[in-house]
Amino acid sequence: MELRDNLACALKHLRYLDKKRRLWVDALCINQSDDIEREFQVSRMDRVYISAVRVIVWLGPGSESTQLAVSTLSHLGRQIEVSRWGSMPSPSCAEPSWYHTGSVLPYNDQAWRAIYEFINVSWFERLWVIQEIQLANSNSVVLCGAHEISWRLLHRSLLCLSMKRAIIPENIMQCILKSLSLTLPSREQTLQTSLYQSRFALCSKPVDKIYGILGISPPRFVRQLVPDYRAYYGEAYKTAFLEHAKIVCRFELFGWCSLSQPVMKMPTWVPNFSKVCAPFPLQNRGICYASGFSRCHYSYKPGKVLNVLGLRIATVAAVSQSAIESFTDLFNIFNFIQVEENKNNRYGTGQPLLDAIASTLSCCFLSERFPSMGTSVLSLEELKNAIMTHLGSVIKDKVVEQKLKSLMLHVEGRRLFTTKEGLMGLCQDCALPGK
């Protein structure tokens, strides 16, 4: 049997010298070239990992810096506790302030380099490992050469680092953000959230964007989806969309629909789950759709047409040229709606135009609406001042920059549109003038 170098290296490190050891390795225990066998195994993958005595993650043989990375991350993981609602100091911690987003970690360049080398490996980018480690029990460990760290401690340390975006080296933060799908509690999330969190994860087949997270998907959805590797992946995407809509009675997955990145040979309403630029699900932060959380009404018969009931309230007049991906794009939006020239004008609802712009671009994620967030989010006045102060210029205030980064999470991948009725909103690339 042929083995890839990494697997051969792992087996040599994992074997006992004096007794037999029983391991389950998907690359060996599943015939990857047999689609029928893969379909059967995919549907029971969750039971395999839930039933395991423990899951062992193999990162590779390691390097000279591995020991420093493991000791640094282990110590960091011992300082915090993590729950569904955030992080807090561990009862036995030696550094009670490290959990806080603004707390600077006393690491030198050597330590940061060791951490980067440790997490900058392919395992953290793979799609299938998300459900494997999410379904694993608390005994699970991560091995890198001869060095070991419990997944519990690594999970906590990565979450702690991810919350310090303003003070973590950029190269490390990029690696951490790609690994967030491993550390966030996907088993308790909606399908929409799991798809969003895993959007950067890599897989060999487009259909695995769905099949690869079935183990952590809502049971009602999983029961309706039968893995089929012999069919065109677009059919799996369509089935996933329709079955999910039937269960939740909302079109939550429309965020993956795209005219610029459509699923070939499929209707434009079929989401493209293989694209990585899907926008952030706004309801994750208590932000509603334009229609609130009202039920959708639709009908579908086999074919290409999806009949949807809606209300015609406005006509699109213009759409910003490109999606918002950076602060530069955000400033281009301000030019698109001529903020400087119209800052004293009134919006279609009667409120000041600048208030409407700030509310739209923040999706109303402001301290006035979420007072429990305190100073971690901008107020309407702070955002308006930031817009006018930094219009087309470099943001020098680190506090303002950090808060604007939080705002960017809502608008990334979206475009601004205006209507003939004098209104504005955020949309996908499928909104066209005249619609």
Tell me the role of every PLM-derived stretch.
Residues 1-81:
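Chitinase-like catalytic core of GlcNAc-active glycosidases
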Residues 22, 40, 47, 62-435:
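Acidic/Ser/Thr/Pro-rich low-complexity tail/linker regions in eukaryotic proteins
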